[in-house]
């Protein structure tokens, strides 16, 4: 006899990406990493942050990691706007990797910044 596990396991990032098909697993992992780092930079205690604050944290992380190639990397993963960050956040909320406050909406991620401006135009060649 074998014991059956009653608890349902969370889907991993690869499973979420395969099911949704808009974003790569790397995109989902990046947003998750960015949330953790953004919260740590703001406070020592875990707390809620806004969609705009998360987008700014993700922008900084992308520039730190990839510099002038940040837009290319993000676009390759399916992320083309700050709204896409929100789409990933809400996918992760749906799959219990993140949580949201009652006041949070997808609109919090609309047009926080323009990718061309912050990832491409700021670098002079």
What are these regions (language model features)?
Residues 2-125:
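Non-transmembrane, aqueous-exposed alpha-helical and coiled segments at domain scale
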